[in-house]
């Protein structure tokens, strides 16, 4: 089983977008991005999506042909992003639609993906912001 913790934000909303993520398996950290900057004009939700996409893309590449059998648990504090990728909520903002499609496309390449909300304090504890 693989676990992803992701978080993103924006200084200004929209403003300077940034994000981070951690990918673990069996308690071992496989990949950790502490701060990836996404440039100006980025909203909080776009930054959240970009962090999730970065983590899913990294894990997909890391696993290669084995991705289709992998179980992945994704944890984040963005209810909007998590509910949209689960299909529980519609994507009403056209600016988020490309990010949503990319995240779903990546998630569909794994055997099983569960999207779980956690409190912001868990993101801070794991990712440092």
Model-identified regions with their sequence ranges:
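RNase H-like nuclease fold core
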Residues: 1-46, 57-61
């Amino acid at each position: 089983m693989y676990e992803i913790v992701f978080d993103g934000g924006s200084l200004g909303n929209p403003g300077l977008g940034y994000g981070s993520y951690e990918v673990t398996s069996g308690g071992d950290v496989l990949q950790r991005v502490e701060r990836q900057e996404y440039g100006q004009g980025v909203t909080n939700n776009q930054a959240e999506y970009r962090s999730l996409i970065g983590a899913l893309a990294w894990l997909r590449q890391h696993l290669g042909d084995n991705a289709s059998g992998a179980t992945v648990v994704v944890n984040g504090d963005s209810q909007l992003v998590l509910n949209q990728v689960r299909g529980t909520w519609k994507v009403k903002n056209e600016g988020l639609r490309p990010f949503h499609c990319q995240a779903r496309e990546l998630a569909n390449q794994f055997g099983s993906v569960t999207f779980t909300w956690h409190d912001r304090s868990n993101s801070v504890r794991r990712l440092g912001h």
